[in-house]
Swiss-Prot record:
Modified residues (Phosphothreonine): T353
Modified-residue entries (Phosphoserine), positions: S29, S67, S193, S213, S318, S326, S412, S426
Compositionally biased tracts (Gly residues): 1-25
Lineage: Eukaryota, Metazoa, Chordata, Craniata, Vertebrata
Coiled coil: 149-175
Key words of the record: Coiled coil, Phosphoprotein
Gene giving rise to this polypeptide: Fam117a
The protein, known as: Protein FAM117A
Disulfide bond residue pairs: none
Record carries keyword Coiled coil: yes
Cited InterPro entries: Glcci1/FAM117
Organism (species): Mus musculus
Disordered as annotated region, ranges: 1-83, 164-183, 242-293, 403-451
Length: 451
């Protein structure tokens, strides 16, 4: 292939600038001259036909014969490749930074810089095409690197202009909406011709049907949902529903005592309330006097008692200094929790308060006016009951079977005594409970409850 290419460049008897109709066959025999008549079918060629686009002959190889391919081989050493027109970047960082930012690296003067020549990476000059024949084919090239130097310079200038217009237009796009809904290429060209000026106030609100950028869309949504609603609608949205609202702060006139005794309502200076429009020094003096009088009137008896050191901590006679100490259970603090945010204060009925000394101790026993108890004494002693409260004893014990171990004897009439000897003899073998047998009036009971 290289021999065929060299033969095409050298010219010779094949014609000006043509490398033959079908190239060369793979072999040493030279092809037939172009003017000789072809007889019959030609053998199958093993090379791909090609044609060079060079109308003129080279000056250095014009007088050499091109009939033999090896005769034009020394031409390669004669032709020196010109400096290539391949652009190289300065460093890898330049490529990466510009690629990530979406910008094309450009030179200071807008032209190509001088690059070093490397035979291993440069394209030979023999493969390049002259500018005259390439003018008609420049629109069909795949990229700008296949074109001429002027074409690539023009493309580079266009890219630089586009980058400059993008940079100057980036500040304007945040505040301006797109006036055209369809084609944006014409919009970009029109904006590139506009002179750059400092950003002014935002453009007036356009119709919502027009296209907007991301910032414009956010602004439009904000106007729809916030600004277009009236003041009453905004107040209704911002109003906290009933039950979710935190309790109102207590008034100073009615809740001075709670403000003084609750440590949650005290600031860093414990005698100064939260909402104090006066200076701290003057307010602390006035509050100190007021707290002293109020606490002296409320806790006068407690402070006078020797066993209760509520207001005399660390030997200080001032009652307000008890609030500044650590919250010890010394009866100088009211341990009350403020309700959490969003909850209302509920007044609880105080049941667990300790009774005063004038109140009697309440027992859990039943009322003595309704229930009457009769003490029975020992369980083994006979007790005489009130007769009208019970029926006759004979009727009660008539149905009860008598047993030898039964503690309740049967009510039977006794035999009359015969004499003192007989009574002594009869009383000896008898049990202790049989010595005085009960009559109908007295029966052995352990206890009785009379209602």
């Amino acid at each position: 292939m290289s021999g065929a290419a060299a033969g095409g460049r050298g010219g010779g008897s094949w014609g000006p600038g043509r490398g033959g109709a079908g190239g060369l066959r793979r072999g040493c025999s030279p092809p037939a001259p172009a003017g000789s008549p072809r007889v019959g079918l030609q053998p199958l060629r093993a090379t791909v036909p090609f044609q060079l686009q060079q109308p003129h002959q080279r000056r250095d190889g014009g007088g050499r014969a091109a009939s033999v391919p090896c005769s034009v081989a020394p031409e390669k050493s004669v032709c020196r490749p010109q400096p290539p027109q391949v652009r190289r970047t300065f460093s890898l960082d330049t490529i990466l930074s510009s690629y990530l930012l979406g910008q094309w690296p450009r030179d200071a003067d807008g032209a190509f810089t001088c690059c070093t020549n490397d035979k291993a990476t440069q394209t030979p000059l023999s493969w390049q095409e002259p500018e005259g024949e390439r003018a008609s084919f420049c629109m069909h090239k795949r990229s700008a690197s296949w074109g001429s130097t002027d074409h690539r310079k023009e493309i580079t200038k266009l890219k630089q202009q586009l980058q400059r217009t993008k940079l100057s237009r980036s500040g304007k796009e945040k505040e301006r909406s797109c006036p055209v809904q369809g084609d944006h290429a014409a919009l970009g060209a029109g904006r590139a011709s506009l002179p750059s000026h400092p950003p002014g106030p935002p453009v007036l609100r356009l119709s919502p049907c027009l296209h907007r950028s991301l910032e414009g869309l956010n602004q439009e949504l904000e106007e729809v949902f916030v600004k277009e609603q009236g003041e009453e609608e905004l107040l209704r949205i911002l109003e906290v529903p009933d039950g979710h609202r935190a309790p109102a702060p207590p008034q100073n006139s009615s809740c001075d005592h709670s403000l003084l005794l609750e440590p949650g309502n005290l600031t860093s200076s414990p005698s100064v309330p939260l909402a104090s429009p006066q200076p701290p020094s003057q307010a602390s003096r006035e509050e100190h006097q007021g707290a002293t009088e109020e606490l002296a009137s409320i806790h006068g008896n407690k402070a006078s008692s020797p066993g209760n050191p509520a207001f005399l901590e660390d030997g200080s006679p001032s009652p307000v200094l008890a609030f500044a100490a650590s919250p010890r259970p010394n009866h100088s603090y009211v341990f009350k929790r403020e309700p959490p945010e969003g909850c209302e204060r509920v007044r609880v009925f105080e049941e667990a308060t300790s009774p005063g000394p004038d109140l009697a101790f309440l027992t859990s026993c039943p009322d003595k006016n309704k229930v009457h108890f009769n003490p029975t004494g020992s369980a083994f002693c006979p007790v005489s009951l009130i007769k009208p409260l019970f029926p006759s004893m004979g009727f009660i014990f008539r149905n009860c079977p008598s047993s030898p171990g039964s503690p309740l004897p049967t009510a039977s009439p006794r035999a009359p005594r015969k004499g003192p000897e007989a009574s002594k003899a009869s009383s000896l073998p008898s049990e202790p409970w049989q010595r005085s047998p009960p009559s109908e009036e007295s029966v052995l009971f352990q206890s009785s409850l009379v209602v």
